[in-house]
């Protein structure tokens, strides 16, 4: 037990220094303790403690179910009192199951929620979107935060939360019900939309195709799909690009579901927040390639947001010291609009 306490203290030191060698040494010792505890009855009580330290090193991804309340403010200055929040959303993050990564709240979600609320709060009333579609909603934080804030500004505001995985959809509906939100939960398969939008069949194979489930019709029947003719003022997507093909699929979804510019709503937009991870640079590059100036949609603005993400272990962070609140992370906020000379532009 004293050994576990010492290792827990070392885990805190490794977390602060982000020392990969130290962290690996700790994992080796902890795995040996777990193995020893599993084979020696007198040391069985070591298993739980050693395992808890391993979870601590693994970060949020290894945690079980938990509830967390997020508060959003119009001013960036801290500290703040929760009573000053213009929106607050309680979210349940479920335990990771298989490929259902969206069941956890990734670090990009609260940053995109805050940015959009602050942006719309400083805009003219006629710019406020009436219909919002969230892609790859995951735990639903972005859509639910917008639904709460927009609902207080205009009574006709409506937010639709979408995802693909059955486990994620079940948790998404749970969060929507817990927040007493008027947001709808729907199933949406980006790849199916992409294929429907193609004039010729294209054969390709991606990692996502190998890992994602194939019960699309089942989940559409259970949760309802998004009508192919539905159009929205704004589309939002936080940390949804984890395969280079996804940007292409999202482009197809935007072509189908993003409102064309009109006099009443001249600037429909797709907002994407993409974390810059050294393991996913190809995915980031795909966004620039797909939404280039030659596309019907193009990137109108790019903003950099600095923040923290405690989803993974310290090894996923940069070489800078790791803050207690998570791994430092840089996100790119893409504001994507219809190209003015696009044939799709109204």
Question: Can you describe what each PLM-predicted range is?
Answer:
Residues 1-346:
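S-adenosylmethionine-dependent methyltransferases
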């Amino acid at each position: 037990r004293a050994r576990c306490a010492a290792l827990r203290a070392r885990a805190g030191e490794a977390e602060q220094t982000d020392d990969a060698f130290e962290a690996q040494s700790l994992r080796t010792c902890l795995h040996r303790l777990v193995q020893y505890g599993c084979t020696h009855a007198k040391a069985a009580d070591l298993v739980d403690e050693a395992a808890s330290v391993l979870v601590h090193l693994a970060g949020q991804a290894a945690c079980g179910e938990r509830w967390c309340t997020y508060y959003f403010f119009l001013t960036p200055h801290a500290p703040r009192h929760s009573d000053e929040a213009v929106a607050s959303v309680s979210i349940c993050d479920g335990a990771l199951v298989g490929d259902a990564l969206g069941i956890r709240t990734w670090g990009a979600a609260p940053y995109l929620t805050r940015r959009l609320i602050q942006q719309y709060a400083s805009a003219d009333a006629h710019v406020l979107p009436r219909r919002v579609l969230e892609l790859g909603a995951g735990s639903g934080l972005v859509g639910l935060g917008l639904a709460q804030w927009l609902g207080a500004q205009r009574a006709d505001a409506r937010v639709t939360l979408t995802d693909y995985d059955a486990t994620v959809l079940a948790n998404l509906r749970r969060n929507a019900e817990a927040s007493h939100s008027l947001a709808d939960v729907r199933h949406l398969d980006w790849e199916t939309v992409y294929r429907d939008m193609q004039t010729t069949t294209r054969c390709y194979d991606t990692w996502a195709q190998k890992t994602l489930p194939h019960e699309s019709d089942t989940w559409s029947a259970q949760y309802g799909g998004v009508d192919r003719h539905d159009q929205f003022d704004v589309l939002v997507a936080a940390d949804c690009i984890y395969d280079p093909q996804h940007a292409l699929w999202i482009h197809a979804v935007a072509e189908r579901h993003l409102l064309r510019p009109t006099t009443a709503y001249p600037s429909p937009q797709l907002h994407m927040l993409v974390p810059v991870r050294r393991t996913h640079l190809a995915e980031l590059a795909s966004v620039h390639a797909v939404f280039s100036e030659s596309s019907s949609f193009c990137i109108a603005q790019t903003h950099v947001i600095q923040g923290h993400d405690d989803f993974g272990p310290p090894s996923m962070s940069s070489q800078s010291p790791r803050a207690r609140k998570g791994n430092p992370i840089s996100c790119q906020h893409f504001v994507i609009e219809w190209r003015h000379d696009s044939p799709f532009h109204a």
